[in-house]
């Protein structure tokens, strides 16, 4: 049977059977890969520390006939300890990971998403406002999935604002043009921030000020677009974020 060796980031690790763990990774060249790490819950397992969530490393799997592979070797290159030691940073990082897992099929290359996620984690490690980095990640992930919001001008007439965001057409519509019942007002400031996120990504993100009200608008846009993209709006990591802070 074939083997797979690739750089990857551990998105999730959970107990499986008596002594194993089920590990889900986003890899550089093979997309989502899930496999069983056998015996890692036993004392002195060499693999246990290599498969903690948010660990980046080089992983080798044996691919059998089932959907799950078997983890053979792992070499951790970055444990992202700063993220894991801070509950708020950890929750934001887990949210980014959960979005990736929900958005991608298994074993289909997703190199740009892999790169984006690593950039997000690196940015979060230096962030004083982690929600800002998470919202930037949301929008750029949507763009890679083919759901980039149209923000240049009114989708219907090309005119100026004030605007509403209409999830049914994936962009902004001025108040003079018809929109669906899902449409909601979005401020010019929020539109400007979203355009900046999409144009520059994480570059000099620390100098981009995003007030709480605008964070709420941006997350609402992203949440509704993710509902269209993956059919899901509820994420466990969001519940953790809400318990830690007034996250928008």
Regions from the PLM with identified roles:
Residues 1-248:
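Non-catalytic alpha-helical scaffolds and adjoining flexible linkers that form interface surfaces
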């Amino acid at each position: 049977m074939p083997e797979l060796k690739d750089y990857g980031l551990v998105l999730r690790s959970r107990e499986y059977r008596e002594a194993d763990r089920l590990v889900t990774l986003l890899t550089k060249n093979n997309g989502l890969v899930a496999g069983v790490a056998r015996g890692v819950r036993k004392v002195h397992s060499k693999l246990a520390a290599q498969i903690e969530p948010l660990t980046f490393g080089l992983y080798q799997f044996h691919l059998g006939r089932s959907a799950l592979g078997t983890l053979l070797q792992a070499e951790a290159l970055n444990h992202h300890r700063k993220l894991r030691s801070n509950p708020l940073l950890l929750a934001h990082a887990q949210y980014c990971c959960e979005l990736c897992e929900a958005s991608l099929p298994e074993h289909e290359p997703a190199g740009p998403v892999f790169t984006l996620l690593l950039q997000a984690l690196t940015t979060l490690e230096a962030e004083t406002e982690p929600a800002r980095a998470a919202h930037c990640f949301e929008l750029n992930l949507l763009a890679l999935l083919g759901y980039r919001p149209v923000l240049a001008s009114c989708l219907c007439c090309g005119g100026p604002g004030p605007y509403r965001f209409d999830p049914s057409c994936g962009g902004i519509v001025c108040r003079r043009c018809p929109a669906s019942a899902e449409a909601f007002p979005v401020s010019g400031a929020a539109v400007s921030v979203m355009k900046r996120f999409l144009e520059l990504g994480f570059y000099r993100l620390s100098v981009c000020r995003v007030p709480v009200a605008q964070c709420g608008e941006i997350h609402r846009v992203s949440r509704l677009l993710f509902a269209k993209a993956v059919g899901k709006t509820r994420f466990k990591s969001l519940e953790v974020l809400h318990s830690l802070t007034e996250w928008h």
